[in-house]
Amino acid sequence: LCACNYSKSGYTERDMETLWQANVQVIREVVIRSKVSADKIAGVSFSGHGKGLYMVDKAGKPVYNGILSTDTRAWKFVKKWEKDGTKEKVYEKTFQDILVCQPVSILAWFQQEKPEILSKVQYIFSVKDYIRFRLTQEACAEYTDFSGGNLINLNTKSYDKELLECFGIGTLYDKFPPLKESADICGYITKEAADLTGLIEGTPVAAGMFDVNACGIASGLDREEKLCMIAGTWSINEFICKHPIINGTVSLNSMFCIPGYYLVEESSPTSAGNMEWFIRNLMSYEKTDAQQSGRSIYDITNKWVEQIEPENNQLIFLPFLNGSNVAPLAKGSFVGLTAYHGKEHMLRAVYEGVVFSH
């Protein structure tokens, strides 16, 4: 519905208007297929990918493409912060490492490379906050998303201008919308959005949450004894805790959607996004055939992988098409490729590379 734009190596973007139209289409289809009368829908909300950056001007129009969590353009800034002591300084407030895809890193890149873009910005959003804004015309941010982006002082649970100044973006302090809890009502469906989506004007819209919070809730992550693994664009292993883990053994602490808990996370952009790339670039015929026959492309991929015995493969895939959490410039590759190997062997290697990256 909304393809990514890879204009340069390390750049991952989406047209924000196309993204909005894709969400409109999906919402309308859900309302129709559910066979639930729209006036019976008590409220709506969203989850969306974390990290990345979505910016609009005073008229609510995008000032640039949306930037996704697999974007690595800001790697030089993170390297600088690791060397000059910024990493240690901000950790005292955010309890997390600095990633190239976090808003603070990307905003620092814009500050240096495209300041004319930042001069137009009225609001800085995460992806779900942008979609909610389009539905309600109310600008809000949400704790689980922004606390995972080095934007919030976890000691005070608030924005911190001194924290932003550590990244060189203190002048943007006023561009961050008011913070809301996941279940807070942030606005109501406008008439325009109702006409587009099939929802009823005035339907409440809640803040929503960072997608790995939603995955955790769906997986039953409701107490500290449980562990959740997510194989999405990112390889994610997570649990929740009533206090942040600050002994240096984990990379990320952020606020969880259940009040009083923190999400403790290790993650890297080395998961099923690699398989998506393989399907898009090496299985276009099979994908078309699956669509025409009413099958899922994943039925085909699973069958291929099942046919290859591990001992007959001896092919290794390094799942770093989008870099990694510790090496943003890492590159993916197949190692051991011979004339014997076909796409089935390569796909099994991708599966194995994703699994071992966790």
Residue ranges and their predicted role:
Residues 1-65, 76, 80, 92, ...:
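N-terminal glycine/serine-rich phosphate-binding loop of ATP-dependent small-molecule kinases
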Residues 2, 7-8, 37, 52, ...:
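Glycine-rich, flexible loop/turn motifs
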Residues 8, 32-69, 97-101, 132-153, ...:
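Short beta-strand-loop/turn "lid" adjacent to the catalytic site in phosphate-handling enzymes
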Residues 82-100, 105-140, 150-170, 185-358:
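Active-site core segments that coordinate phosphate-bearing ligands/cofactors
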Residues 168-181:
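A conserved helix-loop-beta module that forms one wall/lid of the active-site cleft
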